[in-house]
Amino acid sequence: MIAVEEARPSVDASPGRSCPLHYRYRPEDFAVEAPAHLQGLDVLYVVGGLYGNALALERVLELFERETGRKRLVFNGDFHWFDADPDTFARVQRQVLMHEALRGNVETELAALDADDDAGCGCAYPDWVGDGVVERSNRILKRLRQAATPEQQAALAALPMWQRADVGPLRLGLVHGDATSLAGWGFAQEHLQDASHRETVARWFDRARVDAFACTHTCLPVFQALTADEADGAEKRRWVLNNGATGMPNFAGDRSGLLTRVAVTPYRGPERRFGIVTGSGTVHVDAIGVEFDPVAWLEHFRRDWPAGSDAHTSYFERITKGPTYEPREAVRDVAGQPLSCRLAAHSTSTR
């Protein structure tokens, strides 16, 4: 893998692999105060990769309703995807936009005025993703455009690409992709296995002046630890918090989605899959299982995407079996090695 300091135009400019210039921002953009309504939070839910799963959305809202204190729910992109039925599309968008929302590549391309835009699905897929997946994703996006009204497209276009939030003492950058692009793969679990790339990510944190980035986009969850030296010589732990997907399974044999919960109190329910403690022991970060009826969801999915359709070909196996990935792989120390779920549950930063 080649680590890059800045997001640069993809060598492959083909639809679905390119990363358009208007997707980009700088790590320095995050070195600002959070807006007032996202400061001093007790609980923050970050929901990425909902993918038009209305049943998962209902479950997210139920879980969030249980929370107390100063709380906010943020959908950080790709909340549309499988919702090709106009009624479902409208319901998903209406409920999502009642809360804080960012646009991912899906929403950005849905909002594009030029339906022939060469970005395709805007996924900026890396080279380990096959051409067939890329081509099918481009066609899924093209079909999804037919479900959106001009008014809905305008609402999507108005959404920001990133945001800042504070939970307790923790400064978070909220993104869809990574610290340089809404479709960046710099926070993918595959890339974060590479030591030189983790050094690049650490420099992004230095420039962004945040303690954590909460992200999604790359479809597999990872909580990756990074360290930074403080002026007084102490070591501070920072985190990439990637929830994988809320609307699809994230682990083999577990058909639940995941959301990232960042809070000043621990999560006590059985939905918790893994987590860490940071902010000098004051902030709990957990991956919460979004448990919806898998049979009902599969029936809904098949109505819009029957066998032989692009989404069915690309996603049916994952929806029914989950990816070849385990919870023990999802929480990693500064060397990129997995932490046990027990250690991850009790680990704290040194600052």
Which sequence ranges carry the predicted segments?
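Short, basic, glycine/proline-bearing loop/turn elements
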Residues: 70-78, 139, 181-188
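Acidic, His/Gly-enriched loop-helix segments that form or flank divalent-metal centers
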Residues: 144-287, 292
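Acidic, His/Gly-rich catalytic cores of divalent-metal-dependent hydrolytic chemistry
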Residues: 2-27, 39, 226-351
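Short aromatic-enriched loop/helix-cap "lid" or pocket-rim segments at secondary-structure transitions
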Residues: 112-117, 186-187, 254, 298-300
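Active-site neighborhood of divalent metal-dependent phosphoester bond hydrolases
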Residues: 86-164, 195-204
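Residue-level marker for buried hydrophobic side chains located in beta-strands
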Residues: 44-46, 73-75, 101-102, 173, ...
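N-terminal active-site segment of His-dependent metallophosphoesterases
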Residues: 2-95
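Active-site glycine-centered loops adjacent to acidic/histidine catalytic or metal-binding residues
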Residues: 49, 77-78, 104-105, 176, ...
